[in-house]
């Protein structure tokens, strides 16, 4: 459903041509709307015939080697953000979509998976000990910080949104305050919570303490 990316510099022809996508964005701008791209830099397709997994004859030009190469839950490949080639490739990708298609920003997919060595799997993020315990991928955090800096330099009013489950402190703080520079955090747990509550819990059984915990978690 679009999250195992094979070509990072091309929109899928299933939905139209590049010119049609550009025209769609221009039309939206004409109505005063911002167009935010859902950008996937958290992983890539494992299929070597169409993706980057064996681009230079090895499995690790863009990705980790060994145990960290494959994502344990997504059946995909994990970028090695510590490599200059990867950093340049992904930063250039951000700039490409801004310059060539005039997108107004990005919703970064799977940020939790990027910033933790465990990908956030099986973690209960309930305090600072959960965020600062050597389980963080410093290279990924560096990449995301540079990406935010680049995006806002290329397009001053661009918007960046992090899909992030853990509530990492500083995620949406400015660079000058030591943050990663995202404008917003998309807290996926809150929508899921409300959907479940509205569908499954009777009004008279709503618990204020439970709701407060979820909203401030």
Per-segment meaning from a language model:
Residues 1-136:
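Substrate-binding/active-site clefts of carbohydrate-active enzymes
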Residues 102-104, 119-217:
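Conserved alpha/beta catalytic core and glycan-binding cleft of carbohydrate-active enzymes
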């Amino acid at each position: 459903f679009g999250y195992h990316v094979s070509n990072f510099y091309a929109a899928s022809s299933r939905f139209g041509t590049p010119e049609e996508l550009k025209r769609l964005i221009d039309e939206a701008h004409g109505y005063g709307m911002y167009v935010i791209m859902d950008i996937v830099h958290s992983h890539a397709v494992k299929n070597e015939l169409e993706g980057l997994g064996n681009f230079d004859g090895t499995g690790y030009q863009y990705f980790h080697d060994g145990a960290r190469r494959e994502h344990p839950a997504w059946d995909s490949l994990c970028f090695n953000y510590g490599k200059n080639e990867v950093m340049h490739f992904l930063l250039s990708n951000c700039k490409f979509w801004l310059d060539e298609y005039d997108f107004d920003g990005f919703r970064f997919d799977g940020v939790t998976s990027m910033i933790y060595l465990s990908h956030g799997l099986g973690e209960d993020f309930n305090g600072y000990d959960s965020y600062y315990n050597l389980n963080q991928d410093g290279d990924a955090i560096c990449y995301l910080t540079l990406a935010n800096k680049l995006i806002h330099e290329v397009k001053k009013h661009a918007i960046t949104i992090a899909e992030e489950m853990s509530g990492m402190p500083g995620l949406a703080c400015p660079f000058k305050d030591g943050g990663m520079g995202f404008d917003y955090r998309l807290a996926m747990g809150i929508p899921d919570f409300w959907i479940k509550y509205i569908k499954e819990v009777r009004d008279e059984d709503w618990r204020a303490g439970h709701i407060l915990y979820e909203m401030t978690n």
